[in-house]
Structures are given as structure tokens and as C-alpha cells.
Amino acid sequence: MNEKYAALRANVGMLGQLLGKSIKDHQGQAFLDKIETIRQLAKSSRKGNETDRERLLDTLRNLSDDELLPVARAFSQFLNLANVAEQFHTISRRCEEQVCTPDPLEQMFDKLKASNLSQEAIIQAVRELDIDLVLTAHPTEVTRRTLIHKHVQLNDCLEALELSDLLPRERDKILNRIEQLVNQAWHTNEIREQRPTPVDEAKWGFAVVENSLWPAIPEFMRNLDERLQHHLGVRLPLDAAPVKFTSWMGGDRDGNPFVTAKVTAEVLELGRWMAVSLFYKDIKELTSELSMSDCTDAVRERVGDHPEPYRALVRELREQLRETQEFLTAKVQGQASESRDLVKTTAQLREPLELCYHSLHACGMGNIADGMLLDVLRKLACFGIHLVKLDIRQDGERHGQVFSELTRYLGMGDYAEWSEDDKQAFLLNELNSRRPLIPTDWEPSDETRETLDTCKVIAQHDPDAFGIYIISMAGAPSDVLAVQLLLKEAGCKFRMPVAPLFETQEDLMAGTAVMERLLSVDWYRGYIQGRQYVMIGYSDSAKDAGMMAAGWAQYAAMESLVALAEANNLRLTLFHGRGGTVGRGGAPAHQAILSQPPGSLRGGLRVTEQGEMIRFKFGLPKVAIQSLNLYTSAVLEGNLLPPPKPKECWRAVMEQLASVSCDHYRSIVRGHPDFVPYFRAATPEMELGKLPLGSRPSKRKPNGGVESLRAIPWIFAWTQNRLMLPAWLGAHKGLQQAIADGQKGVLEEMSRQWPFFRTRLEMLEMVFLKADVWLAEYYDTRLVPKELWGLGKQLRQELADSIQVVLELRPQGDLLDDQPWIKESIKLRNPYTDPLNVLQVELLGRSRNHAETLHPELDQALMVTIAGIAAGMRNTG
């Protein structure tokens, strides 16, 4: 690494040395020497030294069974520590210009002021900001919570070490604590003993809120408020909430039988309990701050002649919160507790606090009002008393199943066999009817009972506790109307927004027609009251058609949905179901947002934050603030300075690119007779099922092939063997065809002028740097039957061709030359990830050949390599 990253290198070196000390103390000097030899050989191998590469392979192949687990753990833990150092570096005082983005909000306001926009337009856009970040528990977060907690403490220690005026004994104390934490991590099992339950996942999400987002939000809001004041002379309203958080943890039951109505109800109570507990802590602290005596008449009317009027007001809240906390604690623990003076709405907390705020300003104490009191008001606006809203997601087939059972019971035939027109007529008739549809004596199947119970849970809770109801694999208007009828039958008194999820290429292309039909229904127009949500699926469309074709289908779908919304005077919020990887729509937030069609952000931004990406983007308060600043600046830019509409010649090229790339992708993934056996042999796909990653099964149908495999394990498996196939397969064929047709100049123009296309190429470059042809070949030679080697050789050649064609279109000399920080970050981790790949091949070979006699420690070692490679690749699923 060059001198720009000296501070990062120093921290990585220090943490590595301390890990080495822990290893030596536990395993002895000879073992540590072996680890160091492997590390040096891996670095030399990376530089192209063939002799050292062979020595590396020999050393790892000849490890005894007893050595495999500790060697795997050593490299896996080093990668985790490198990630800690890297994440800290982005928020450290020494973070160089090449690494840290200058304050994106400051840059954005400068950019907006330099444009011809009026102040009013900018102020209006800031006030209309509506960013909803949806935390999901997709099973790619392989790091245990206990280790994450130690990593957060390591970050705090690295931050403390940066202080220039530390006394020697203070510095020694911090270094000793770092050594303790590294040692604790080494002696902690990095693999969970059991899969987390959906409630465990929800608790993990709540912990992210408590430890990181709770302190980050007021700081982020203060920063935005100050920028607005400095540049435009106005302030954010007290109830402003430009960013809010929703969760799928405990609400997403699509393909997860463990997320039941009971689980959803429990998670709702836990969220409320956590929110009340956090506000109770804050209000207690606020009570000690608000000791002032001057107040307005409005406050006096509430508290009488109390000498400390603000404390008197806030103490009432504190007592209410304490009683609510006790009540909810008893409820969560399954104990009976009488209902008392409980906090049931956010307004109950907001009203007295706002009264204090305005009084302090009126009495010349605005500086005090704008301290902790304002911070609590900002948290109330963002989190409310439910902490995060809960989305509900279910497969559309499950709703149809309810009506099939019911219509058969009622002697009306089978709903599933009806035409779309007949389904709509039936559903609308029942939606308009005042009598109940479901007979009290009907005994549905367990699955149907579960669907009905979920709707009852929604009906029984506060509307503010919920986000939206998402229907997976929605393909017709009846899919949406069916959910609305189920909610009505459950006694739901509020209009829960229902969003179809269009996720295959075919569904994306048909999505606008589905919405057009829905909007032609008067009842439906009345129900939505001018507000519509539509979810765009990135994972399944890419798995279905390949990254390039899926990207264009998503863009075209968004564009036509935006036009439909404008024609119908609707506020449309597009909900982006992105993952961390390129194969699942992942891209740096700023680039991803600015590559959307013009007008697609007018209804706000709603996007999933998945698995390990939650930790990388929001795991530390300062990192979370950075991420929130980036999102905010990107949405403002996307709305006020939108990207250009694509030229007709760009569209024509993209249509051809999408068609050619999709055909090639499907010819391999669906059409090649050797593909499925090759995939199963060349990747740890079968073994991934053993890793206790998340609560959701990895397959929709237990015995299905690739098509039944969820998008996440599909991507995860290809990331492990470093072929990274879903992120690039097919794209190169489309690009090669366009160049052969004389369109190279148009492609270069698209790369320069069109953010959508440029982002596609940049994401490919990042994937190519993480991919590795010799490692992918090593998996083949050791694990794949010889008769399947031909396909592996073909795919590796296609990877090489893909790199070549992308470099032809990019002005810089090498991959990611214009993004040096990302390039250095990948280069830092590669020498530590490579030995884990070689070890994984060795372990897979031993596991598959001697499954019956395999030592349990080898199974554990295999799991460690999977987790370690995930840490090395960062965005794994």
C-alpha cells in the first residue's frame, strides 16, 4: 500500500501483531511461524511468483487435521481486524482526502447554490426529504454479535489512541485494552452454535439502533440543520424526519415458516419496549439538565408555581415512561400486569417537550433548548415509540391459497382456477360488502390460519407500528386486492399501504400494466388516496436474467411507473430491494441513487439495507452519520439536479445489450446440461446450508434446483469460490456485440454522460478485482469431476474476456484506477483471503470424500473459512 494509507497500515500492523501474540501464547511459536510463512507466500503469490504459489498450496494441503481449524481461524480473524481498522480509518482524524469524502452535505449545498435553482426550491426539497432505510436480516451477516461488540470497542480504542496529548500511562492503558479485546476475540468461537431465531434477528436490529443509530440521528440532524441555516438562513422544523427506519426482522415471512403471527406480535412489543427504555434513559438525563426557573405562561399553567417548572414537566414524562417500561417488561416476559398511565403515542411525549422547547427559546435560553432537548425531539420524530416500523412481507401464492380454500368450502369452486377478471370481480364485491366473508365455523388449514392470524395482528396494533405490506411474486391486480380484503376481514380499521413486488424480468416488464389496471378500479383509487408504493426486486431479476439485463429491466420499469404516477397525479414511492452485492443490485449509495431514472425520487427513497451491509454502513455512530449524509445529498441531487434522460441511441444500445446478455446468461445457467452439477461441485453451495447464518431456509422448495435457490445463497456460493459469476455473466457478450456492431463510440459516450451505465461498468470493475481466475481453477481441479472441467474453463475464459472488454471502454489504464481507496481496500485483504480459499478447497475435498468419518473440528474449520472469505469479500450477499 502506498504512503497515502500509512495510518491505516500502521493500525492493521498493530492489530495483526497483537493477534500473533495471542496465537503464539495459545498455539506456540512454531505455529505462529507457520502462519507467517503462509502469509508471506500468499503475498508473493499475489505478485505472480509461481514458485511461492506452489509452496503455498503444498503448505496448506499438508496441514494436519489438528492444524486446519486454528490456521483458518488465524486468517479469518485477521480479516475481521483489518475490516475494523479500515472502517475506523474512514472516520479517523488522519483520514486522507483520497479516502474520506469531504462533507457531502457541504458539497451538495455548494453545488445547488452554484446552479440556477431558487432558494425556495432548495428549501422545499430539503423539507420534503423522505428517506426510509429498511433493515433486513438476510443471512449474509456471518459475524456473531459478541464479536461485533468487541470490534466496536476496538474502534473506540483506536479513536482514543489518536489523541495527541496522551500521557504514556494513558497510551499504555489503551494498548493493553486493545490487546485484551484481540485476545478475547481469538478465544471466542466465531461460528454460532445455532441458527438465530427471527426474534434473535430482530434483537440484533434493535441493537444496531440502540448502539449506533440512536446517537447518530441527532448528530446528523444537527449537521443538516446547520448547513441549511448557513447556506439558506432557515432551520428544519422541529418535527422534521428526513430519514426514518423500518425493519423486516420479524415481519418478513416470505419463505420463512419461522416468522409466525406470534413472532410478529412479540417483535412489535420488543420494539416498543426498546423505544420506551431508550427514551426513559434520555428523559432521566434531561431532567437533570432542565433546572432553569424562567418559563412562559403556557408552562406555568401546566405546573403551577413549581420553582423548577421544566423539571416538573419532564418528571411527569419520566414517571409515565417508567410505568410503561415496567408494564412492557412484564408483558414481554409473559407476566400479567395491570394497565396503568402508559405512553401509547409519540404525541404524548412530543407535546410537553415542545412546550419546554418553545418556552426556553421565548425566555432567552435558545442555546439550552437546542441542546439535549432538541436531540430528544429529533429522536422522537425519527423513531417514535415503536423504534422502527415493521413491514410485513408474504408470497402472493399464500393469499390466493386462503381464497381457494374458502371458495371451495363455500361451494363456489376453486379461486385459483378463476380468470383474473373473475377474481377481481369477487374481491371488489367483497371489499364493498358490509357483511363478513369468512364463516365463524370454518376450519382452515394451518398455513391459511397463519396468514389470517398475521392479518389479525396487524388489525390489533397501532397503525404507526407498521410500514407497508409487500406481496412477493405479484403478477396481477388481484394479488393486491386479495391482501386488502384479508385485512378488511381481520377487522383492520386503517388503510395499510400494500405494495406489489415485481422481481423477475418478466414481472418488471409487466409491472406498469398491472398498476394501470389497478388504478382503473375506483375502489382502489379511493383506498390509496393518492399514495402508491411499488417494490422493485433486484436479487431475483438478476438471478433470472443476469446483471446487465436485470439492470435495464429495473430502469425501464421505474421509468414507466414514474410516467404512470405522473399521469394519474400519484405520489409514487419506489422501494428498492437491493443486496450488498452487484448481483443483487448493490452499489455505493450515492452512485446507485444517481443512476436511477429522472423523477424516480420525487416520492422519496425507500431501500433495503441487508445483512452485513448494515454493519459496514451503520455499525458505528460516525460511520452511520457518514452514510446518512451520503444518502441525503444523493436524494437532494437526484431531485434537484436529475441525471439526463437517456438518448434514443443509448436506449437502442441498452435494449440490444440486455437482450444479448440475457440470452447468453440463460444459455449457461438454464440451458447448459452441466451447469447445475458444476455449480454444486465448484462452490460450497451444499455446505452453506450447514452454516447457521439466518432464520430463513436457503431454498424456497427443499428439493428444487438452482431456480428454487434463494438469490442470497446463490450469490454467496459464487463469492466463496471467487468466480463471482452472477455479477458479470452475460454482460461481456452484450458489450462485445455492441462493439462489433460499431457502437464503441456510443458506449464510451454512455459511460461518460449517463450515470446508469457508468455505475454498471464501475460495479463490474470492483467485482473483477475481487474475482480470481487461478483460485476458481484450483476449486475445479480439486473438487469438480473431470467431465465438467470444460464448463469451468469456458467460464474462466469468459471472465477474462469480460475484464478485457470493460477496460476497452474505460479511460483509465487498469481496474478501479479512478477509485484508489476501493482498490487499496481490496488489495489489503486479498493476501489474507487467498489462503482461506485454498484451505476451503482442502476442507471441502476431505468433507466430501470422508463425510462419515470427518472430525467435527474440520466441519467447524470449513464454517470458519466461509465466514472468513465473507469478511474478505465484504459485500457477500
From Swiss-Prot:
E.C. number(s) listed in UniProt: 4.1.1.31
Reactions performed catalytically: oxaloacetate + phosphate = phosphoenolpyruvate + hydrogencarbonate
Reported cofactor(s): Mg(2+)
Catalytic-site annotation from UniProt: 138, 543
Protein's GO biological process: carbon fixation; oxaloacetate metabolic process; tricarboxylic acid cycle
Pfam families associated with the record: PEPcase (PF00311)
GO CC, alphabetical: cytosol
Entry GO MF terms: magnesium ion binding; phosphoenolpyruvate carboxylase activity
This protein's UniProt keywords: Carbon dioxide fixation, Lyase, Magnesium
Function summary: Forms oxaloacetate, a four-carbon dicarboxylic acid source for the tricarboxylic acid cycle.
Similarity field: Belongs to the PEPCase type 1 family.
Protein name according to UniProt: Phosphoenolpyruvate carboxylase
Source taxonomy: Bacteria, Pseudomonadati, Pseudomonadota, Gammaproteobacteria, Aeromonadales
